[in-house]
Amino acid sequence: MNLQHHFLIAMPSLQDPQFKRSVIYICEHGEKGAMGLVINKPLEQLTVETILEKLKIKSPSRDPAIRLDNVVLAGGPLAEDRGFILHSPQEGFASSIHISPETMITTSKDVLETLGTSGQPKNLLVALGYASWRQGQLEQELLDNVWLTTEADTHILFNTPIAERWQAAANKLGINIFNIAPQAGHA
């Protein structure tokens, strides 16, 4: 089972504040474990524009018509000072990895320099931090009914309002997440 380019959808019973009602986009899943970004937990009052200002990135070809008020996401509890840009495929960045035909992840500064210009990726989201699982940990959490899984949908990833992503991801499975009991029973 490889869950790269899948969503993990937190079950209602998951009460950990870092992951309660979260949707995680799995960027990598292999023999050594898994890595993903929470895509529905905004960092209050932190926008892409704020990040660019803090890093003193100012492009001379900045187009004022391109909005930079996108909220930055809390990607997970690990390395919360490290930025990740999830975006539609576009070549030419120093540290980019293809996740799927529709998505790439970049961690290099050069992608930030394109933001607000005609050279920026068509679709993107910016996250600080990430979530990871050691070998076998995610599989055990799935067996323990911590997460639902479904193949990722780029419309949910890039275009669905943040507050609606948890339900939208569950809808892909034909589930109204609000109708699931928060406790699991055993017969």
Swiss-Prot record:
Pfam families, per the entry: DUF179 (PF02622)
Family: Belongs to the UPF0301 (AlgH) family.
InterPro entries named in the record: AlgH-like
Signal peptide: none
Cystine crosslinks: none
Cross-referenced SUPFAM superfamilies: VC0467-like
Cellular component, GO annotation: cytosol
UniProt source species: Yersinia pestis
Domain of life: Bacteria
Name the UniProt record assigns to this protein: UPF0301 protein YPO0936/y3322/YP_3506
Sections of the chain in a coiled coil: none
